[in-house]
């Protein structure tokens, strides 16, 4: 007869979880069975919430992800395929093998912030990408939907990126110094904030943009100047999202 495993007093085995994300974490953790104590489960959840891409796990490495060529339902007016592939490899592991669809573009949908919110309010995770008047390309990964919240929101999975230097991607992950990952109101969308400056701020119906270093992401200025004019802007969502 198989010996029944004992658990510490006050703990019960977890037999089933509805969340696909948590289920996938168990698979990545390669646990031989489903009997996990609550402390063990919380440890895995902490890894997930920290924004880790699980580079130390064999099934989800940046090296493997860099070989995947993502598809976009409508060709981007900003990204080149090589740039999109490079950015895709920096995403949280559960997006790295997922194709994209464009849900907003100022060339198609106009520059009104209200139109942006209408198109994007149900999109939980997205890539925001901007091209300025000098041809610089930069943006951010948003872990929550863009809605007018008038407060800071988002998670530590958010990050900023730029192709400004040598046309290779530079990523600025969250530092954990504050939780000012995203901000929205009726006039602007922003990412990162400290000392009254935003890492990325798009205002005046997406005509004007600003970028400063903040403690949220410890980022450099995302292009070559603090203030810029937005020429193109797109928001891409993930298939199934």
Predicted regions and their residues:
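Phosphate-recognition beta-domain surfaces
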Residues: 1-241
């Amino acid at each position: 007869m198989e010996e029944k495993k004992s658990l510490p007093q006050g703990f019960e085995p977890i037999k089933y979880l509805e969340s696909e994300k948590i289920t996938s974490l168990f698979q990545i953790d390669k646990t031989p069975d489903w009997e996990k104590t609550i402390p063990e489960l919380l440890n895995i959840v902490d890894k997930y919430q920290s924004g880790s891409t699980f580079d130390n796990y064999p099934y989800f490495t940046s090296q493997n992800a860099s070989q995947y060529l993502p598809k976009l339902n409508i060709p981007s007016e900003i990204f080149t395929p090589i740039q999109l592939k490079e950015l895709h490899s920096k995403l949280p592991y559960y997006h790295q093998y997922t194709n994209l669809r464009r849900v907003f573009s100022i060339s198609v949908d106009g520059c009104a912030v209200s139109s942006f919110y209408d198109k994007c309010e149900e999109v939980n995770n997205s890539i925001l990408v901007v091209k300025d008047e000098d041809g610089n390309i930069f943006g951010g990964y948003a872990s929550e939907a863009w809605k007018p919240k008038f407060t800071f929101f988002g998670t530590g999975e958010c990050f900023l990126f730029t192709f400004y230097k040598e046309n290779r991607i530079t990523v600025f992950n969250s530092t954990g110094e504050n939780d000012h990952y995203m901000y929205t109101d009726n006039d602007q969308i922003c990412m990162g904030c400290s000392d009254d400056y935003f890492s990325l701020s798009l205002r005046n119906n997406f005509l004007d943009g600003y970028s400063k270093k903040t403690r949220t992401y410890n980022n450099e200025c995302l292009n070559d100047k603090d203030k810029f004019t937005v020429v193109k802007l797109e928001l891409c969502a993930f298939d199934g999202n």
